[in-house]
From Swiss-Prot:
SUPFAM superfamilies: Ribosomal proteins L15p and L18e. This is Large ribosomal subunit protein uL15. Binds to the 23S rRNA. HAMAP family: Ribosomal_uL15 (MF_01341). PANTHER family: 60S RIBOSOMAL PROTEIN L27A (PTHR11721), LARGE RIBOSOMAL SUBUNIT PROTEIN UL15 (PTHR11721:SF3). One of its GO terms (biological process) is translation. The keyword RNA-binding applies.
Amino acid sequence: MIRKSKKITKKRGSRTCGYGEAKKHRGAGHRGGRGNAGHQKHKWLSVCKFNPDYFGKYGFNRNPCLIKQLETINIGELEEYILKYKDAFQVEEGKVVVNATEIGFEKVLGKGRISTAMVVKAVEFSEGAKEKIEAAGGEFVEL
């Protein structure tokens, strides 16, 4: 069993309890303010030495209207969509013709499995989507 008395118990009766002069223990004046106070004034040298990149700007934020965000759909979801709304799509030469932009999607991604032969028209295709469409006996057309 550890028998160690607390520091404050040891310091009792020594008037300042280990804080030196009495006024050093009042508020945050003895340490020059709390936290990061004074980092552009009297603590500036410590900023220069230990954290020189704290102040100032670097890098940039790209204008959001310039960022191209495409609406995407996975090839597995596209097949489910086709099976759900069969009457909305045309069939040419045994292949279902799907225009992804008319449904509201610009890019076709390759997640999922397909068994239906289809002609898919979209702005962009991922490599996986191209492989899976051709493996199922279909074709892709980039608009």
